[in-house]
């Protein structure tokens, strides 16, 4: 299934995308695409519904973040071998983790606001793992049972805030609008192999990122297992699994977002995003 949320910011309603690409309103069935809805029982309940019995959403509504009330947005750094090579850094011996403020989350096509004082706002297309079952100290072979599905994440990053301002990376990762997710969450059963997905990103029509999840250093199952040893995971938590090469910081010369530019990005089978960069005060 493809589950999504539509409507104005703060007033999103749950929906699914049917086989014909029509948005079907789920608000008469579930409160939101969040928390208990993402559990195996919640997804089974939605899966038993005939999509044709649900109201069609007319027009072209705003698409919101595909998961509501995200408890944790956990990110993995340097998790693509070719991206680490681009950055001139050794492969990490275990996953590099950092948190991204959930207040950064926005819809997949919302404008990206460049923070005040920013000169190095950058892009990162990433595969997002949506947790569907509470997890603590998982055995490796249990990890995938705790995954509800997958989504596209753009891990927008302000490199000067992240790298040059001392402290942790969260400084450059957490501005409002720095976490577009969606357009929808695709349930785990519809993604045959999360380690064989193409992902790409372009700016103003020029493709900068064109990679595959095959080059991940640590795969989906390992990440879920590993993180569960360090913190509990709850339904609706999202893990952003790292980015392939082609970020602006890695260009020669470096390139960063300016006001009025258009980012387009996507992951094979998971949909596409489209964002315009604007001034913070626009």
Please identify what each model-predicted range represents.
Residues 90-108, 121-123, 258-269:
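Structural signature of FAD isoalloxazine-binding scaffolds in flavoprotein oxidoreductases
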Residues 131-133, 138-153:
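RNA pseudouridine synthases
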Residues 14, 126-130, 151, 200:
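Residues embedded in well-ordered beta-strands
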Residues 71-74, 94-96, 108-112, 119-127, ...:
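Generic beta-strand structural signal
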Residues 1-95, 192, 207, 281:
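N-terminal non-catalytic cap/leader segment that marks the start of a structured domain
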């Amino acid at each position: 299934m493809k589950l999504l949320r539509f409507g104005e910011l703060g007033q999103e309603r749950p929906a699914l995308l049917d086989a014909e690409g029509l948005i079907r309103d789920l608000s008469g069935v579930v409160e939101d695409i969040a928390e208990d809805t993402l559990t195996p029982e919640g997804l089974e309940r939605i899966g038993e519904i005939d999509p044709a019995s649900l109201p069609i959403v007319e027009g072209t509504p705003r698409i919101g973040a595909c998961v509501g009330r995200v408890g944790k947005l956990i990110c993995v750094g340097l998790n693509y071998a070719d991206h680490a090579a681009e950055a001139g850094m050794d492969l990490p011996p275990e996953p590099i983790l950092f948190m991204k403020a959930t207040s950064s989350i926005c819809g997949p096509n919302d404008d990206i606001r460049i923070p005040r004082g920013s000169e190095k706002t950058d892009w990162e297309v990433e595969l997002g793992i949506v947790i569907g079952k509470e997890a603590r100290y998982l055995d490796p072979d249990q990890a995938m049972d705790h995954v509800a599905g997958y989504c596209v994440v753009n891990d927008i990053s302000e490199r000067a805030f992240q790298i040059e301002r001392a402290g942790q990376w969260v400084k450059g990762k957490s501005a409002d609008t720095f976490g577009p997710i969606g357009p929808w969450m695709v349930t785990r059963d519809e993604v045959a192999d999360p380690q064989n997905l193409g992902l790409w990103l372009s700016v103003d029509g020029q493709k900068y990122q064109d990679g595959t999840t095959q080059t991940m250093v640590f795969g989906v199952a390992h990440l879920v297992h590993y993180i569960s040893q360090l913190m509990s995971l709850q339904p609706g938590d999202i893990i952003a699994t790292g980015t392939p090469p082609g970020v602006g910081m890695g260009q020669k010369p470096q390139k960063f977002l300016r006001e009025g530019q258009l980012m387009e990005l996507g992951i094979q089978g998971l949909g596409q995003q489209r964002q315009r960069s604007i001034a913070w005060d626009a």
